[in-house]
Amino acid sequence: MRLLGTVSALAGALTLLGPRPIASADAASPFDVSDPTVGRLDPALLAAVQQAATAASADGITMTITSGWRSPEFQQQLLDDAIQTYGSYNAARQYVQTPQQSKHVSGQAVDIGGKSADTWLIANGARFGLCQIYANELWHFELAADAHGNCPPLLPNAAS
């Protein structure tokens, strides 16, 4: 498999084929609002991620944002790269939304790293309103818990 674009560009596109190709230098602190991928997140989502990161830190877990807000052009680039990687639009859509459908473009989705942070957030995220949305993306979270702190059932993938 060849990596197209930047390494961090594929963070949301690659899922079950192996570990996400993200170097720690590509990750942003949830508190670095000068980074547009963080600073352009929906304010409620950003606050929830920051609260979760603080709580995770108390448990010895470092939480980073590997992908947050994305421009429509960047989202389209991710989709185009995924089409090349997976061989078809339909296969790519299992991993990457269109710019019109992506919650990243509206600042309402965030990808969290590393693996221990993903695991921690899957177990504890609902306390902050944060829910894993797709079964094949352990790192993708949205502010989706209901008033009782329950997350919706997982969707199989982004095309669902």
Model-derived features: where do they sit?
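Cell-envelope/glycan interface and biosynthesis
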Residues: 21-160
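Secretory targeting and sorting signals
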Residues: 1-21, 25
